[in-house]
């Protein structure tokens, strides 16, 4: 049987986490509407609540905000998201468009065409639960066009030397 203190602490932690997620959703909604100043204020309240109660927000909530200016990071609106490989490691690079702060989050590459090992970059804007599985089991769409090998004009066209 669990002690009363551990039961109380668990319910307290649950209440604080619920409030943190509510504040995160509210800040994201304000940022989507273009009220970034208000969204920053709500994000500051979220992190003040976490510090005063000593209940850390989950990683997925912390990564929704810039560590420097507390702007909610929404891809295409307040953040730029890129996937980079460097020195055998792969990173999701998130750049805050408000202050220019760069966040690098390492991830492991999964098998091609299989389920991703780390959450996709599109999940940054969603505050939903991470189920661990993709909802859509179908193909991921047509392959990307363009890139270094598919550029038109200029460069070597693959013929014999001396053409």
From Swiss-Prot:
GO terms for cellular component: cytoplasm; ribonuclease P complex. Pfam families: Rpr2. Gene3D superfamilies: 6.20.50.20. One of its GO terms (biological process) is tRNA 5'-leader removal. Binds 1 zinc ion per subunit. It catalyses: Endonucleolytic cleavage of RNA, removing 5'-extranucleotides from tRNA precursor. GO terms for molecular function: ribonuclease P activity; zinc ion binding. It comes from the Archaea. Its cofactor is Zn(2+). The keyword Hydrolase applies. Residues 152-163 have a biased composition (Gly residues). Its main location: cytoplasm. Its EC number is 3.1.26.5. InterPro entries: RNP4 (IPR016432), Rpr2/Snm1/Rpp21 (IPR007175). Consists of a catalytic RNA component and at least 4-5 protein subunits. Belongs to the eukaryotic/archaeal RNase P protein component 4 family. HAMAP family: RNase_P_4. Part of ribonuclease P, a protein complex that generates mature tRNA molecules by cleaving their 5'-ends. This is Ribonuclease P protein component 4.
